[in-house]
């Protein structure tokens, strides 16, 4: 570093401490980057790359961003997965002796960003810590912007995947063992657009992790936090806490609680089910419109929007908890006038959770405090209205809601109603709040009057008509005279600067006024800054009260949203049972009915139980509505268990521990799996993890392979699921394999349903109605016609359909079903080694005549291509003659 400037030496020393970060180094009004960081940032942000002399042979690559636009540039870099260390000036350069003191004040990473501009207010921004120890995964999750902090443990990769999918963390930190746990970390990165990094081993010391948690939460034992059964989870939580301390370099005083949870406390919804049911985003466009969240979200606050997402992702499994939410919604429905008033008062409320986070971090600006104050103004009105309700959940929310009138009063007295964004420009503290501030402000105001008087006197004295007193930060106050009047300037004017069209001067009197005014301004700005920090710290000390109120507001917001949706959409309060019965009368798909106009949606019934109606085989043509019907049932069950009313005339919902769906066909390009492989992987997951209390939705199992393989797999899956000794889960099973309808009457609990279709000549009309019985046709050719397939193809398809229908496998399917009727259901189809295997045995109904026999005896290996074609032509002619 010989020959380098002291500033550049300090820059490199600082950079050495943060080698994995881009270093934003404050120099005056800019944050500058040098060397590799400059090359990276200029490319990623598309900003100009320049150079700086630093004592080396070549100029150092350099680029910079304005300090007032920091958040925007930070957000763009963090979105791309970079970490950024911010080195700030710790003293006023005017007062500094020698090199200005600078130090890193925080490190911003994808999981620790707190800027309101950078965050989606409707979503949490999670940092996840994962440790893999003794074949268990400890998981800790924190949203540093809101103070949420949760911990759990799981034993399998599948459970871990469910938790990652549930929280969709922006950043994952882990121990080295995680990379050899069997988890495909590259797939996790790509699928969730997250950053994964291993931390040094000291982050995962059991003793160190326990110590940092006890110190932060001020407890002598972690048992008091409910962490006694989470040994691996504690290590994950301690690592996350230390990482947040190291990056934020603050006390994290707004993280006041840690919540341990078991994955079994809520309905488990795996990754494919979340995707297939389109709970939070659509499968194709990845948009909110067209999802269950889109239908249910009428929340007014950011806190409520985030909580509603959590409700959808974590449906309840305890009857009392579900009924508590239902009763709250019902009472709000009955008192809709009060509900609408509450919504009006909720609407102006800002994001209290994230505001108190920024206040605790000391990053909140004056306008944040005004937003905070304006939000608090609504609380007394909401408190009064909530006092009218009597249901336990609404009473609990009323009790938790603290109007925070003392905090509101403090901000109202101290901060002006329309303050500047910057803390350093003054104009923050309201008149009458602090005596010394008022005095200095008066001196500043009078000083401007004195300047105006001086300007008038000098203009009269010199005769310079356009003489003006002006100011800038470099030269202070000065007289400005245009060149046309330069000859009239008196001798006591001292030149300060020459411009192209004017000259700038000062005088003894102007210098005296300048010292007086600027002295008052400097003192005023310093005093105002100190007073603002006092007010901010006073609010931060009330973090527990504010967070409790924020949670209450979020809960009220979600309940009023669900109530408003139930009223508008004619939803009903479902009964909840623990007997495994799902009985829905005239159920409707909550999303599809909102996407359709003029109430055209056709409602349908669903009945499933644990005995005689375990598995419904649903047949019917494509486009008839099978998938919509099955998704509709799953969504109604999920809505009921999150406590919502449901789209039906009547519903009685048995609590499900999990919902599984296998709907639709798509290759998983991210993991390199074909459609069929994806399908079989998901089926395997269902068969291994479902219980008799689960709801399973399977659509078209067995596609992507040969007809016989597909039918065999689908058949075996039906037998396995419907067998109460093996599984016995409630299931909706849509299929094009009409042969499976033969299982009704031979396997207990299996029933056939189909989509009603009306034929009009060669055309069909889908009635969208589920009726008892199996479909006798697939109507595939008619669907192709509806889709616009050319007439010539349709005509040929009809000809082939007639020919191929002769090779009917239905009769053989019926024989197998009846043969299996007296055997255990999981062995209904005889094992391959227990039967006389014949090639294409399902086609035994096709008579093995001389043509078939001759085909079987052909020695293709000894035939030339011409011989083979001649033989094929002869056999074809023989077959045609027989048909004629």
Q: Residue locations for each model-derived region?
A:
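ATPase nucleotide-binding head domains, primarily ABC-like/P-loop NTPase cores
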Residues: 35-38, 230, 300-301, 311, ...
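Conserved catalytic alpha/beta cores of large enzymes that bind or transform nucleotide phosphates
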Residues: 164, 169-177, 183, 198, ...
């Amino acid at each position: 570093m010989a020959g380098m400037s002291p500033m550049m030496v300090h820059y490199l020393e600082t950079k050495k401490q943060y080698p994995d970060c881009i270093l934003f180094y404050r120099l005056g009004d800019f944050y500058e980057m040098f060397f590799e960081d400059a090359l990276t940032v200029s490319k990623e942000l598309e900003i100009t790359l320049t150079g700086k002399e630093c004592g080396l042979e070549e100029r150092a690559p350099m680029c910079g961003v304005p300090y007032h636009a920091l958040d925007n540039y930070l957000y763009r870099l963090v979105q791309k997965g970079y970490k950024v260390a911010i080195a700030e000036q710790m003293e006023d350069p005017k007062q500094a002796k020698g090199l200005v003191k600078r130090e890193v004040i925080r490190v911003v990473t994808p999981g620790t960003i707190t800027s309101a501009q950078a965050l989606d207010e409707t979503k949490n921004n999670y940092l996840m810590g994962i440790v893999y120890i003794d074949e268990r995964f400890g998981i800790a999750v924190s949203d540093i912007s809101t103070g949420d902090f949760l911990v759990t443990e799981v034993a399998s990769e599948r459970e871990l995947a469910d938790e990652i999918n549930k929280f969709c963390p922006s950043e994952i930190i882990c121990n080295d063992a995680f990379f050899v746990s069997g988890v495909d970390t590259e797939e996790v990165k790509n699928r969730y657009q997250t950053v994964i990094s291993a931390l040094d081993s000291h982050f995962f010391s059991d003793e160190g992790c326990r110590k940092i948690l006890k110190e932060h939460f001020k407890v002598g034992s972690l048992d008091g936090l409910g962490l006694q059964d989470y040994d691996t989870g504690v290590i994950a939580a301690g690592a996350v806490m230390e990482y947040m301390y190291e990056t934020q370099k603050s006390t994290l005083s707004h993280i006041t609680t840690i919540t341990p949870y078991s994955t079994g406390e809520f309905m488990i919804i795996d990754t494919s089910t979340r995707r297939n049911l389109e709970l939070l985003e659509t499968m194709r466009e990845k948009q909110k419109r067209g999802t269950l969240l889109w239908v249910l979200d009428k929340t007014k606050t950011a806190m409520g929007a985030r909580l509603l997402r959590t409700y959808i992702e974590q449906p309840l499994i305890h009857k009392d908890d579900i009924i508590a939410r239902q009763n709250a919604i019902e009472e709000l429905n009955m008192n809709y006038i009060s509900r609408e008033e509450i919504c009006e008062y909720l609407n102006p409320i800002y994001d209290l959770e994230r505001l108190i986070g920024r206040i605790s971090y000391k990053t909140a600006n004056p306008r944040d405090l005004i937003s905070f104050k304006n939000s608090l103004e609504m609380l007394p009105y909401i408190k009064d209205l909530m006092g009218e309700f009597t249901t336990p959940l609404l009473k609990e929310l009323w009790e938790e809601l603290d109007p925070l009138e003392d905090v509101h009063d403090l901000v109202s007295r101290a901060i002006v109603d329309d303050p500047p964004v910057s803390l350093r420009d003054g104009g923050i503290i309201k008149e009458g709040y602090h005596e010394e501030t008022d005095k200095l402000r008066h001196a500043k105001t009078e000083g401007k009057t004195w300047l105006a008087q001086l300007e008038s006197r000098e203009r009269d004295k010199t005769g310079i008509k356009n003489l003006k007193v002006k100011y800038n930060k470099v030269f202070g106050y000065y007289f400005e005279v245009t060149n046309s009047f330069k000859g009239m300037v008196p001798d006591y004017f001292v030149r300060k600067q020459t411009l192209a069209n004017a000259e700038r001067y000062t005088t003894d009197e102007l210098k005296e006024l300048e010292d007086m005014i600027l002295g008052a301004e400097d003192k005023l700005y310093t005093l105002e800054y100190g007073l603002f920090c006092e007010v901010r710290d006073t609010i931060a000390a009330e973090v527990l009260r504010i967070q409790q109120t924020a949670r209450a507001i979020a809960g009220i917001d979600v309940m009023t949203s669900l109530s408003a949706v139930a009223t508008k959409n004619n939803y009903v309060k479902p009964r909840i049972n623990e007997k495994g019965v799902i009985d829905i009368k005239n159920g409707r798909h909550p999303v599809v009915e909102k996407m359709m106009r003029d109430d055209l949606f056709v409602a349908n019934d669903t009945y499933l139980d644990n005995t005689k109606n375990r598995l419904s085989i649903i047949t019917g043509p494509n486009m008839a509505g099978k998938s919509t019907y099955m998704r509709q049932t799953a969504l109604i069950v999920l809505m009921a268990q999150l406590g919502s009313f449901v789209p039906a005339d009547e519903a009685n919902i048995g609590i499900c521990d999990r919902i599984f769906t296998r709907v639709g066909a798509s290759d998983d390009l991210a993991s390199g799996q074909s459609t069929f492989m994806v399908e079989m992987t998901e089926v395997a997951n269902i068969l291994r993890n479902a219980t008799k209390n689960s709801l399973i939705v399977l659509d078209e199992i067995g596609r992507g392979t040969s007809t016989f393989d597909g039918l065999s797999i689908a058949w075996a899956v039906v037998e396995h699921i419907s067998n109460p000794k093996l599984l016995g889960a409630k299931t909706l099973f849509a299929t094009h394999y009409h042969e499976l309808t033969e299982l009704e009457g031979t396997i207990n609990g299996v029933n056939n349903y189909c989509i009603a279709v009306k034929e009009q000549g060669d055309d069909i009309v889908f009635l969208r109605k589920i009726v008892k019985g199996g479909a006798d046709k697939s109507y595939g050719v008619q669907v192709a016609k509806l889709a616009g397939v050319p007439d010539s193809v349709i005509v040929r398809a009809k000809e082939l359909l007639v020919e191929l229908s002769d090779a009917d496998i239905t009769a053989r399917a019926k024989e197998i079903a009846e043969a299996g009727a007296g055997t255990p259901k999981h062995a209904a189809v005889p094992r391959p080694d227990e039967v006389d295997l014949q090639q294409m045995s399902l086609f035994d109904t096709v008579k093995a005549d001389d043509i078939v026999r001759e085909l079987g005896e052909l020695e293709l290996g000894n035939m030339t291509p011409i011989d083979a074609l001649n033989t094929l032509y002869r056999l074809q002619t023989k077959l045609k003659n027989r048909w004629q």
